[in-house]
């Protein structure tokens, strides 16, 4: 499941347990919400255990949104997920910002957009 809210001028998208949600569907949901709220920066929040399918969906959503020039960040306490996200984003040319904490991600996105 994907929930969203606006916090301090930042679109915060929270990915929760979504058994059966396909990677492409999640990528489409994330990218559609980012496009609808363009030019608002976005933070995708992931949990402590992040399945590979969710990582792939976030990277795919980021790829879909690159042309719009919207700042997209990811926040997850999972160090392995952060490393994987950074490596996959770097392979696509970089630009995806990855944080360990949600509050840091939101503050940084807000400050960068200002």
Which residues are covered by each model-predicted region?
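Internal alpha/beta domain cores that form substrate/cofactor-binding pockets in large enzymes
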Residues: 57
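STAS-like cytosolic regulatory interaction modules
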Residues: 1-50, 60, 64-114
């Amino acid at each position: 499941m994907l929930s969203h809210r606006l916090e301090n001028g930042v679109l915060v998208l929270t990915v929760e347990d979504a058994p059966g949600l396909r990677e492409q569907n999640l990528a489409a949901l994330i990218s559609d919400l980012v496009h609808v709220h363009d030019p608002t920066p976005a933070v995708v929040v992931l949990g402590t255990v992040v399945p590979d399918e969710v990582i792939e969906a976030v990277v795919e959503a980021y790829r879909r949104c690159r042309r719009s020039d919207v700042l997209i960040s990811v926040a997850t306490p999972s160090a392995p997920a952060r490393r994987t996200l950074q490596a996959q984003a770097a392979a696509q040319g970089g630009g995806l910002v990855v944080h360990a904490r949600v509050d840091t991600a939101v503050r940084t996105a807000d400050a960068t957009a200002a």
